[in-house]
Structures are given as C-alpha cells and as structure tokens.
Amino acid sequence: MATVITSIGSKSAPDDTVDGPLTMGSASGSGTPWTGTVTFGSAPTANIGDKLYFEDVYYPGSFGGCDGGGTADVVYLITGISGDGLTLTVKYISGALSTTNPYTISSNSVCSVIAQPYIVRFYSTMETWETGLDDDDLYADGDIAKGECYADTSFSSTWGFTINSGNGLSSGHLDATYLVAAESQRHDGIANTGVRILAASGLTSVTIVLHHAIPAVPIHRSFEWIEIDMNADNNCNTGSETIKHYGGGNWDYSSVASHCIIHNTMGSRTKPTSAAFSMSSNYSCAHNNIIYNLTADDCGWGASENTNIWALYQVGNGGQFYNNTVYRLYITTGTGEAIGIADTTTTAHFYNNLIVDCEDGDFGTMGGSVTLYNNLSSDSTATGTDAITGKSAASLFVSTTPGSEDLGLKSGAAALRAGKDLGTGVTIGGDVFASSTTCTSPINFDIDNRDRDAQGDDWDIGADQCDTCYAYNFAPAFLLFLDN
C-alpha cells in the first residue's frame, strides 16, 4: 500500500506553469513503468504530486527511430525532491513507451535535441482529480489517493461534485481518498487565506458529496482544509447543502470533513432543508470547522415552503461533531428555522462545539441517545455534561465585523480551557474516530494547525485553540519586590 499524492491547481499547462521550460542535466532509472531521478543545473520550483510534463515531443521507438510525431505529451509524476532541490524522483505515467527515460525525449524528429519539460499541476480541478481515482496508471489495489490543492487561483464551482470513485481499478480498489489543501496552502482560520472554492455567480449550491458505494470501498474519505465561499449570492432558484456525507456505515467505511471554513451560504425554496454539513451516513464526522453567515429565504413563496437552514444536520446514526465553531444563522424571509445543530438520529456525539447567534436556537431538539459534552451556546439550548450557556459572540470572538470575520477566540472568552480533552481521537465501541487513520489532520489539530495534544493544552471549546489568550480578560500581574 502506498500513498499517491497528486497536485491540483490552475497552473496546469505550459502557458501557466509552476516552472519551466527547464533544462535537464541527466536522468537515471529503470523499470516498467520507468522510475528514477532527473537532475537539473538549478533547482526548479516543484512539489511532490506535480507533473514533469513534455509537450509536443518525440521519443525513442520500440524498434529504433523516433516516435511521437512531435505531438506526444509525456507525463511523469513527481514523487520525491532532493534536499537541495536539484533532483526530482519521478514515475512514468503516460504519453510514450512506459520504459522511456525522460532524458531521451526530444524536440526534433531525429531525437537529437533533448526536450525541455515543464513543472505543472497534475490536475486543474478537484473534479478531474475525482474522475482520475480509477486510473490504473496512477493507483494500485490498496493505495491511498491524496489530492493536494494549491491556491494558484480560487477554485470555481457551479454545482459541486461527488467523490465516489476509487473502486474501479483493474487491480482492486483504493483504501482511502483524501482531498486536502497542501500544507503550505492551508488557511489560517480566516476566509480567503488559503485554498478556496468560490461559488459561480448566480448560484448558491456547491455540494461536495463524500459517498461510499456498495460494497463500501474505498474505506475512508476525507475533505480537509478547504474554504467554501458561497459568494453571498442570494439566488432564489437554487439551494445549498454544502458537504454531504452519504452512504457510510461504521468505522470500516467512514467519512470526515475537517478544518474547513464554510460561509455566506443560502437555502431557498428549491432545497427546503439546507445545511453546511449534512450527515446522512452512519459514523461520519465533522471536526474543527468554522461555519458562519448562513441564511434561508422562502423567496416569496410563503409558509408552504418552510425553508430551513442548519449548520450541522445529522439524519444518520452515530454521527460525530467535535470542536466546531458556528456563528450567525438566520431567516431572511419566510417561516423556516435557522438552527446551529439539528439532530434526528438514534445515536450521535457532540463534543466541544461552540454555537452562537442562531435565530431559532443554537442547539435543536436532540433525538434518541445523544451524547453531549462541553458544548457552548449563546442561548440556553446547550445541554449535557459541562455545558456553557448565555455567552455572546462579542465576548468570544476576535471580530464579527461583516467581511472581516475572525472567529478565533480572544482573551476572556468563556470557551477558553473549558473543553473536553479528546486526545488524538475519540473511542466509541472500541473504534477510534477523527484520528490519523481516518483523515490527514486528526482531531487534536485546531483550525490554525496547533497540536493541542502534543502541546499539552487544556482544550478550548470550538475550532480555535488560543494558546496566547488568557482565560480571564487581563494579563497576569508582574510584581517586583525590592528589599531595602
């Protein structure tokens, strides 16, 4: 089993590159497909998961001569980078003979002039990454597919996409699919500071579906460190259900959405129940997310539409919500409800969630056997062990100024040091959820990537762990005593 990383971003063609054209110094390797190293005189800009890409080239033929006709596009996957950056480890993917050494690829018809490659992203969109999950040239049975997104520009989406591929390999199926922001491209807990999906103008529905087929493979799916900005476009022709967990079952096949920012979304008459996170699969998990400015509008159709907007909506069994921050849900017009957490399950787990300023209740009516620990609300609806109620957004967050929201905690916030310590995962029935076995950033990492567990922190409630904040709104006094 291997983890196969591929990059995703707009710098995916010779007219918009990560780097290049480049002059190679040498290449050494073997095998089918060819794998080896390519060395350059000066270090190219490259990332693991990018392509080494040759456009309109020739390559040595099987029986001598020069094939390709000057129209071959040859692709190698970058799998390693030397410490000095001068040498790339690559694997042949497509476009020539599978045994082709990149240093033998040429720009002329007699294969006498060494071609100059480019460094580009492997995929241009998240959708094409998803489609490629059944590519036998990239993956083998038991592999983990990790798509790493780059903020070359904002990703644009018209409707979203479903992640349900990875079970069609000729050798079998993937064990997991992780769609994440590359580590250097992560947001810092504030909108427009990292990888972002921006809804296309005129739309209010960007739905990312984490889906498990029957039989349930791949086993784990995750969506992490990505902002979804619905563009504050109140279009009454569509609705929004932003991240939907669908078709899961138990630990053996679960899905995770974590470290995301979702904001400025709207539900409307065409989707009367809209949610930032909709859990219709069992044992799925949302942790360390920030959600704010969600609204619903009946668009003039009256009480018969009853349009609702919810931040965290659980309709399966065993759903898990840990260390999420939710702020400001409201109804624009109509008779629907705006609720932070809505639950209709027989079993669910809610730990360390900070939910404030939801027009019709921060926490809705809980059904069945629901476990609640250390949750916080601005009204009186947070219940369960060590719940905190009646705390205003102004007392909790750095900024709630529209367009400049910073939902990190500030000194004096009641959420500071008031959370339940969840370690590096939550054990339920002998299985460990929200851990490194189900996602790339487990529950102990906050929205700023602080490792609460490794740092020995007393946990805060919500997505942000503020290590520089004082639990009371003043700094410790510094006293100097002088002995005369």
Q: Would you name each region that the model predicts?
A:
Residues 106-112, 168-236, 389-398:
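Right-handed parallel beta-helix/beta-spiral solenoid domain characteristic of secreted/periplasmic
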Residues 2-48, 55-128:
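Small/polar beta-strand repeat architecture
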Residues 1-10, 470-484:
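Viral virion structural and adsorption modules
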Residues 114-118, 465-476:
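Low-complexity, Pro/Thr/Ser/Gly/Ala-rich linker/spacer regions in secreted
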Residues 141-175, 182-186:
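N-terminal extracellular ligand-recognition/capping segment immediately after the signal peptide
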Residues 388-468:
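C-terminal accessory segments
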Residues 239-245, 251, 259-412, 425:
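Predominantly extracellular beta-rich ligand-binding scaffolds that present long acidic/polar faces
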Residues 44, 57-59, 82-84, 93-97, ...:
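Acidic glycine-/aspartate-rich tracts in secreted/extracellular proteins
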